Amino acid sequence: CAGGKLDPTAIRVADLAKTTQDPLLAKIRASLRKNHSFCRDLKRPLGISAIYSIEPRQGKATGGLACSGYGSAVTVTAAFGFAATSTCLNQITNR
């Protein structure tokens, strides 16, 4: 989730099991392990690429916005989109 993030250089691509600083990805990871028979070993990769930011959230939630009320800087949301597109294209072309 890009909410509450300001630094586009903190975006990373990694296996879903290795992501940090993202409560939404943590919920997805827990759901996959609990409801869909994914490996419960926290040290093993899940085999799913995820785009996330290592930057802690900035500011306080104000409510009513996406990502639990945190706003987003356009530079961060754009960088998330570019990272996601690059990851998809690399996987499609097997790089």
Where are these regions (language model features)?
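Short gly/pro/ser/thr-enriched loop/turn and capping motifs at secondary-structure boundaries
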Residues: 2-8
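Short secondary-structure boundary segments
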Residues: 1-2, 54
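Glycine-rich phosphate/adenylate-binding loop
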Residues: 10, 17-95
